[in-house]
């Protein structure tokens, strides 16, 4: 085994560098011209590459460097002999060619025998011994892809990933920023770390020398003067910091990313097409919800024809369906109006802060009419207050309109003058929400609620669906409105803990009842990722914003928790059947 490794090392195989494999090329000297690599070297290199050999960095690189001089001397000596033979005319040239061919054949046979001996030794022992490689001073060779081994293919793959990945920060710009931006009066730099999802940026870690908002504004202005609009500077919490800043609050660091990497891309044509298709599907699902709520008023001729298997004769006139569909449209209009008002709230809050939003992508649902909409940020948020305000504006607007419809609908339901506009719904539906069930019970009374069906106004259905959809979107998870608000108020760590709790409650069916599974799948597929950090990701949102969020989450839980049977029976909400 040692003899085989020594034979392989003594041959003009390859010279390993950090980026590629190449033949050794001796430096030119004025005394003698540098010969080209001999055919023996090329033959051995191709034979070694064909074997698919890989070198272990720990034991192989040092040995290869020690063999470098030996390989170079071997190549120079072989070339010098050929050059000396060339002085004898044509016979000398023929002798040189024959000598090179013989040397190539001998070297190839020598390396081939060494490799075959290594393979047979591997078959007997199962693997190459690293100790024998170390003792002989030659690199250990393995056909297995060990964790610390590398090859030309691996290096090319890394380079390819770097080319396909996001563009990194220029080292020259980093040097200029360190020299001209940071100092003992602003931010004393101690070390640097990678920043960003793929390490495409630079995180400057050090000690702050003043008020963070003032220093951050000063650094942003100096960065624009130095590099223009090439980069974005982020102020984030220092990772793995020990304690808080002496001036109060968390210790901060500054992250640097290219503008085209850190900023969201514009809305594409395909996104507009997808948004239009989803909106049409949402309109259809809202109409279907209205039809389902008015199913009790379907013409009896149509009901008999489609439900009686013994029915004969021509089908009923479909013109009878037109009044039925028209009576179902108010529910559809109400659900769509609530969701559109929700999105208008987001845009009204984003406009004065100069934050761009994407076109909303509505999510259809046949139970509630819609699951809401996905609205993306199309510009970097300046601070956490902006994230909180924009995220909370939509749910507040939608909840205000939904509760108004729900309350007015309950009042109209208890008015005998409008009995012709009421629809019959199963009283079991009021057990789906603790908060809304109690409000309905307090408004309609025990006699109306303690029955198999309850006559309610269509506005109650629209308001109920709107409040439920708003409550789902206010859950503190991912990039939902509630998740964004929680991330702005308490940070990503709190969002991770609340998100895990929310997923658990949805999986157990504690929140949302039968809608917990489809809603949980929707969030996992489309909304699970937290929002990207703001430029100033350290600023405090204030006490009243946190208090408003806590109250909102409490109301969300009351809205999504169903009424359990014992409480529903005691309150008279529906008829509870005991088996």
UniProtKB/Swiss-Prot annotation:
Residues 16-42, 104-115, 125-137 have a biased composition (Low complexity). It comes from the Eukaryota. Residues 1-42, 78-146 are annotated as: Disordered. InterPro entries: EGY1-like, Peptidase_M50. Residues 1-44 form a transit peptide. Its main location: plastid. One of its GO terms (molecular function) is metallopeptidase activity. It is an enzyme of class 3 (hydrolase). CDD domains: S2P-M50_like_2. Its EC number is 3.4.24.-. Pfam families: Peptidase_M50. One of its GO terms (biological process) is proteolysis. It is found in: Plastid, Chloroplast membrane. It is a multi-pass membrane protein. Belongs to the peptidase M50B family. Probable membrane-associated metalloprotease that may be involved in chloroplast development. This is Probable zinc metalloprotease EGY1, chloroplastic. It comes from Oryza sativa subsp. japonica (Rice). The gene is EGY1.
């Amino acid at each position: 085994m040692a003899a085989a490794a020594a034979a392989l090392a003594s041959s003009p195989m390859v010279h390993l560098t950090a980026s590629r494999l190449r033949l050794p090329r001796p430096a030119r000297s004025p005394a003698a011209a540098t010969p080209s690599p001999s055919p023996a070297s090329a033959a051995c290199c191709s034979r070694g590459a064909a074997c698919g050999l890989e070198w272990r960095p720990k034991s192989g690189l040092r040995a290869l460097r020690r063999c470098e001089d030996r390989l170079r001397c071997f190549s120079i000596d072989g070339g010098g002999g050929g050059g000396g033979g060339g002085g004898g005319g044509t016979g000398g040239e023929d002798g040189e060619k024959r000598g090179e061919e013989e040397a190539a054949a001998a070297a190839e046979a020598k390396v081939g025998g060494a490799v075959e001996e290594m393979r047979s030794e591997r078959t007997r022992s199962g693997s190459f011994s690293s100790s024998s490689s170390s003792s002989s001073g030659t690199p250990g060779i393995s056909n297995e892809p060990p964790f610390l081994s590398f090859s030309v293919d691996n290096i090319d793959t890394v380079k390819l990933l770097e080319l396909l990945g996001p563009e990194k920060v220029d080292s020259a710009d980093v040097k200029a920023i360190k020299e001209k931006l940071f100092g003992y009066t602003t931010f004393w730099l101690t070390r640097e770390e990678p920043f960003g999802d793929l390490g495409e940026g630079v995180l400057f870690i050090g000690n702050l020398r003043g008020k963070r908002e003032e220093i951050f504004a000063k650094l942003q202005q100096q960065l624009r003067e130095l590099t223009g609009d090439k980069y974005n500077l982020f102020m984030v919490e220092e990772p793995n910091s020990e304690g808080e800043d002496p001036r109060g609050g968390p210790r901060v660091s500054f992250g640097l990313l290219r503008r085209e990497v850190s900023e969201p891309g514009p809305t594409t044509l395909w996104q507009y097409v997808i948004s239009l298709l989803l909106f049409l599907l949402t309109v259809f699902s809202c109409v279907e919800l209205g039809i389902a709520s008015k199913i009790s008023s379907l013409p009896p001729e149509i009901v008999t024809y489609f439900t009686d298997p013994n029915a004969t004769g021509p089908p009923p006139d479909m013109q009878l369906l037109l009044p039925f569909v028209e009576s179902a449209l108010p529910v559809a209009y109400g659900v769509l109006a609530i969701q559109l008002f929700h999105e208008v709230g987001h845009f009204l809050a984003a406009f004065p802060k100069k934050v761009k939003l994407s076109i909303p992508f509505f999510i259809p649902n046949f139970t509630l009419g819609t699951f809401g909409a996905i609205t993306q940020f199309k510009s970097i948020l300046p601070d956490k207050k902006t994230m909180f305000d924009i995220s909370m504006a939509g749910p507040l607007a939608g909840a205000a309109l939904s509760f108004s419809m729900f309350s007015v609908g309950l009042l109209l339901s208890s008015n005998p003058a409008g009995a012709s506009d009421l629809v019959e719904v199963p009283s079991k539906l009021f057990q789906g929400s603790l908060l809304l069930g109690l409000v309905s019970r307090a408004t309609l009374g025990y006699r109306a609620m303690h029955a198999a069906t309850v006559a309610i106004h269509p506005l109650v259905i629209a308001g109920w669906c709107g409040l439920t959809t708003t409550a789902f979107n206010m859950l503190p998870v991912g990039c939902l409105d509630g998740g964004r608000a929680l991330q702005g108020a308490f940070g990503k760590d709190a969002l991770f803990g609340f998100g895990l709790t929310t997923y658990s409650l949805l999986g157990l069916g504690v929140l949302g009842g039968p809608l917990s599974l489809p809603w949980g799948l929707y969030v996992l597929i489309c909304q699970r990722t937290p929002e990207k950090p703001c430029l100033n990701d350290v600023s405090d949102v204030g006490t009243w914003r946190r208090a408003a969020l806590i109250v909102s989450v409490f109301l969300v839980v009351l809205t999504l928790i169903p009424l359990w049977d014992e409480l529903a029976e005691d309150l008279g909400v529906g008829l509870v059947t005991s088996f």
